[in-house]
Swiss-Prot record:
Compartments it resides in: Cell membrane; Cytoplasm
Function summary: Part of the Sec protein translocase complex. Interacts with the SecYEG preprotein conducting channel. Has a central role in coupling the hydrolysis of ATP to the transfer of proteins into and across the cell membrane, serving as an ATP-driven molecular motor driving the stepwise translocation of polypeptide chains across the membrane.
Name of this protein: Protein translocase subunit SecA
Example of a GO biological process term: protein import
Tree of life domain: Bacteria
Binding site for ATP: Q87, G105, E106, G107, K108, T109, D512
Gene Ontology molecular function: any one: ATP binding
PROSITE patterns per record: SECA, SECA_MOTOR_DEAD
Record note on quaternary structure: Monomer and homodimer. Part of the essential Sec protein translocation apparatus which comprises SecA, SecYEG and auxiliary proteins SecDF-YajC and YidC.
Record membrane topology: Peripheral membrane protein
Amino acid sequence: MLIKLFGKIFKNSNDRALKVINLIVKKINSLESTIEKLTDQQLSSKTIEFKNRISDGDNLNNILPEAYAVVREASKRIFNMRHFDVQLMGGIVLNRRCIAEMSTGEGKTLTSVLPAYLHSLLGKGVHIVTVNDYLAKRDANNNKPLFEFLGITVGINLPGLNNIEKRNAYLADITYGTNNEYGFDYLRDNMIFNENEKVQRNLYFALVDEVDSILIDESRTPLIISGPIKSNSDIYYKINKLVPNLIKQEKEDSENFQGNGHFTIDEKSKQINMTERGLILVENLLIKNHLMNKNDSLYSSKNISLMHHFISALRAHKLFFKNVDYIVKNNEIIIVDEHTGRTMHGRRWSDGLHQAIEAKEKVNINNENQTLASITFQNYFRLYEKLSGMTGTAYTEAAEFKAIYKLDTIIIPTNRPVIRNDLPDLIYMTEKEKINAIINDIKNCYSKNIPVLVGTISIEKSENISNILKKLRIKHNVLNAKFHELEAEIISQAGCPKSITIATNMAGRGTDIILGGNWKSEFFNKKNINKKRIKKIKESWVKKNNYVIKLGGLHIIGTERHESRRIDNQLRGRSGRQGDPGSSRFYVSMEDNLMRIFASNRIIQTMQKLGMKTGESIEHKWITKAISNAQKKVENRNFDMRKQLLDYDDVANEQRKAIYSQRTEILNSLDIKDIIDNIRKDVLKKIFEKYKTKHSEKINVNLIKIENLIKKYFCIEISILSLYKENKCNLEKLYKNILIIILKKYNEKENKIGSTNLRIFEKNIMIKTLDSFWREHLSSIDYLRQGIHLRGYAQKDPKQEYKRESFIMFENMLYELKIEVITIISNVKIKS
């Protein structure tokens, strides 16, 4: 509903925004002739002038027109590149806490230098966020000469840097890095024991490249720093061997339905559901293989984990596939991002799924991990004071950007009209027929020297097509997660005549495909290059460029429709950049996952009624619309899932912010004596509140309980009954007098140890205990979340129940934390 409503009002609001933006562009253009007359020295000194104006109370919006005019002029002098008006428009949008949708080839990298320079003037730090290390290094090194000419420093934040190198990267005016590295640095900064080890400054402005990929596609996978916990790896191997005994039960409306299966598969949510027959069989198998005692129940607390392992093993075999969801490399399981096709090194599936897949593939099983710190990208990027982003495809997700990140999306017009020919989908009944048609299309283009980019949704499918082309002796390149290192080089040459490139999803995103190939890369990779040689290379490229243009440009082949229209649009957008010609066509079969899982049965029945012959395709508006509706259905479902993830994570996020804030306060404090004093009072007060009673017959019993707890927590021997009588049976007075005794003893300890030593000890204990209890709490709320959906069967709202219970758990954790801190500090022994 939200998405439909958004679509109706989007066009009008976009047009209104562009009218206002155009007025600012005219103002920037009016300054060009004046700025052109400045010497290099005068131009670069404008940065100091702008900073002085800010110090005097001026704001960025007032400075923007002149600042952008200065950057444009600097770009002309340093790069021999002048910002187009549409790039200025993009830069203005990015200053507005918005997302700029800019088509492929429109120069997003050059656009980004405008808001980056403007915000660097505040000296708070600008973070430019890219999807991989290659793009971070490339963009930082490419833009560095321009920024340095204007007196702005540039840092690159890469994995593997030490603390000093990272801190220096963050201290630069503008820092380039990946979303993963920024997020992990934030988590690591909240695990340090010395404030000097912190690398990040306060999070001010993040400019996210390929914003849809980072804030939407990757938002469901949290960043996790974890540590191993002891676990029995043998159990995974043993249960893995039992999986073949179980039979899948078909859906009731299926012609294969017999009702004798052991489990059903929900492909939409990637879940396994056990049938009653299945549960009985699992119980018998576990007993037979001595994994469970004969008289035990599968549902007892000590055996419930066995059922969990069995479900994980079934998911590993039936829902997660090699070269689709993961690859096996160097005896290790590496996850493949379902949206980008890239490998996700260092990421592991949770809940024992990763170990189950390791058992399935017969590789070494790593221990299950305990979460030490975690955060989703949704919550990390919402920590920034100001956030904006750019991408070639944001419109279809505009409602989500607005709902979750409060970011408006503005579509920037192209510098030149898009003349790409987007051909209608060709729909086949079977996968085999579809693949044959795709191969024929490739052969036809190859014979005419037309460059082709073939987009697939998995490594497995890209390699299937590659194997067929090898048999046909058609030269081609394969670009998938297995060949990540060659990604940019392969994709940059995909526009050469006769070039056939097969790529998973949007691998190579961020690198333009130039018709005729990338002539610059030819001399970058060669030694002893001279101007004469460069001229020859460029002349050769011009001929190839003109030749490919005459052929009709780059041809895009989509081997199936993706779950998201946005991913399809990204693939199409690789062709037809900067007014170049191009074409695209998607091939669909009724056996594709999208059609099989999400399309209605009516479509399949209609296709069957048409009586299509083998190899015959159909082009029909109704079918194309049905495919689009299936995609919208999936997009809405995925949006709901991400929104639900955020709703749950927001609960943990509020607790995370409270813990991290307290931790930072302790780290920054030289003396936490006041904090310890307050903890001491709270613990003692809670003891008295717990055993406070008006019944005289219970008072003596309760006083003894108070005495025992005081001895345990505060390491003090007192006769509380005597003190109670001395204080005329007044509990309030008793509390105050005991507090005085506790403080007196602690002060004696301080005199022996020395104040400085005791303060250091208190601080270390406080931080270590806080970290330990927070880790345990993360595990506890994770377990709570995994089972909270069961509350729905009791007519309770799982989300509200999760909020309520996690709050109680958090409150209890904080009190237990106080007890632990005071117990350790009070019980410390002083050695002579």
